[in-house]
Amino acid sequence: MTKGILGEKVGMTQIFTESGEFIPVTVIEATPNVVLQVKTVETDGYEAIQVGFDDKREVLSNKPAKGHVAKANTAPKRFIREFKNIEGLEVGAEITVDIFAAGDVVDVTGTSKGKGFQGVIKRHGQSRGPMAHGSRYHRRPGSMGPVSPNRVFKNKHLAGRMGGNRVTIQNLEIVQVIPEKNVILIKGNVPGAKKSLITIKSAVKAAK
């Protein structure tokens, strides 16, 4: 059965194991998620649970949103997401970090840091031209394509907005779970800036 929870990226730190191994970890704070809705094939056409994370002030919510969370007897939420293949939960139930344990393998999804408008070297890793000896080609994108189509093909690597994309990193290991602090320590780095929304789910392609 799939397990999943929403959390907030706190930052990175490092821990040492009992054997003295040094492990860089990302700290994810995941306060209890509340099940807001249970979707079924009969009513919605598919099966999933809808969870809310991070309370927000009622003055910032409209009446439909207040009515929706009232069914779960909870406060309005900043983030609402869905998880599939999760069973046995009812509206109003809480999902806490102790559903995971050290050694679990998970997929982590977040929004990558926005870098603004960048050129092809930073954005796509292209090589630059000579920087001296009369060269007039330094950090430009280069050829736009052959003459015969007389146009630029779609998906040509050019300058543009970089970052701010939905990114998933697969098969990351959970190093430690601290239930009393609602904290999960994940080995390595995860996408996103500090205080950004992070989704943690059971790994889809984990080695069996």
Curated annotation (Swiss-Prot):
Example of a GO MF term: rRNA binding
The record's Gene Ontology cellular component field reads:
cytosolic large ribosomal subunit
Q: Please name the GO terms of the biological process aspect recorded for this protein, alphabetically.
A: translation
Q: Which Gene3D superfamilies match?
A: 3.30.160.810, Translation factors
Pfam families with a match to the protein in the record: Ribosomal_L3
Origin: domain of life:
Bacteria
Where is the region Disordered? 117-149
InterPro entries found in the cross-reference section: Ribosomal_uL3, Ribosomal_uL3_bac/org-type, Ribosomal_uL3_CS, Transl_B-barrel_sf
- Coiled-coil portions: none
Give the keywords, sorted: Ribonucleoprotein, Ribosomal protein, RNA-binding, rRNA-binding
Kindly indicate whether the keyword Ribosomal protein belongs to this entry: yes
Fetch the NCBIfam families from UniProt. Answer: L3_bact (TIGR03625)
PANTHER family found in the cross-reference section = 50S RIBOSOMAL PROTEIN L3, LARGE RIBOSOMAL SUBUNIT PROTEIN UL3C
**What's this chain's function?**
One of the primary rRNA binding proteins, it binds directly near the 3'-end of the 23S rRNA, where it nucleates assembly of the 50S subunit.
- Family (UniProt): Belongs to the universal ribosomal protein uL3 family.
Record's subunit section: Part of the 50S ribosomal subunit. Forms a cluster with proteins L14 and L19.
* UniProt name for this protein: Large ribosomal subunit protein uL3
Native organism is Streptococcus equi subsp. equi (strain 4047)
